[in-house]
């Protein structure tokens, strides 16, 4: 196994670990999920560039008769990228004491202010940062508001 293959294996394991954690780990941490809201997908251009670069690397490796293991690892990385960026639906998961957003846990008592922007983005001001929550369905904003008001 070359250094390139080792780096690819590390990236594949990291992305696979993130996908499993995001899909099933956040579902089980900090108690039962009381409200799950789908979010808009972001970074389409970045994901297209990354997937395209992986495809170019696969083509280059095949054209130059590179190692078969490298081709398979690049293919696995490409499939993981397609799943993470194009198939998986990002979600915000509300629990009894807080919520998961972008893989991070936020307790309700850290929310200092909530505002709704003109374009339908829920802005939550936390102690040290601001969260921009873009929901897929605009009606979900009302569900989020009522859930937070009733559960604090």
Curated annotation (Swiss-Prot):
It holds the Pfam family DUF986. It comes from Cronobacter sakazakii (strain ATCC BAA-894). This is UPF0266 membrane protein ESA_01432. Its main location: membrane. It is a multi-pass membrane protein. HAMAP family: UPF0266 (MF_01071). Keywords: Cell inner membrane, Cell membrane, Membrane, Transmembrane, Transmembrane helix. InterPro entries: DUF986. GO terms for cellular component: plasma membrane. Belongs to the UPF0266 family. It is found in: Cell inner membrane. The chain crosses the membrane at residues 1-21, 45-65, 67-87.
